[in-house]
Amino acid sequence: WICYYDGNAEAASHQQWTEGAIKRQEEKYPDMYQVCDPVEGSSQEAAYSAAKEVIATYPEIGGFIGCDTNDPPGIAMAVEEAGKAGDIAVTGTCLVSQAKDYLNSGTIKTFTFWDPADAGEAMCSLAEKVLKGEAIEDGVDLGVAGYEKCTVKDNTVYGAAWVDVTTDNMSDYDF
């Protein structure tokens, strides 16, 4: 059993991540199912409160995935409070500054983010290409790791520069 958090309902990226996670889960893990519709909220307190409710209602839940950076630490707090650290998986998009204590305790084993410096550099490279009149199309190389072969769809440029964070590499990031 799993519960998804989609963070801010106004954020298209959160909706896309949630939809993608659900699709992947249905394809790869057909015996796993959602216990509820994706939970909405964009604060650590909201994630904590909702996770407490989900854990109370579905004590056999196996995991949570959060798309807003506030979700994993809020969920992890509820998981620890319920005494279920190690029994309930918690992951999603987060920052080291928010989740390092939960990584160290093992309540969160891994989470993902995009390095804002790399994303900013890629956006500057993209802006430079646009100003020079260069074609922005599938395969465009923005010269930044993870943005060497971007996908372009509906005026949106997608890279593959996510960073998976664990206790092994969390000290590499100071944000």
Where are these regions (language model features)?
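A residue-level marker of the well-folded mature domains of exported/periplasmic proteins
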Residues: 1-175
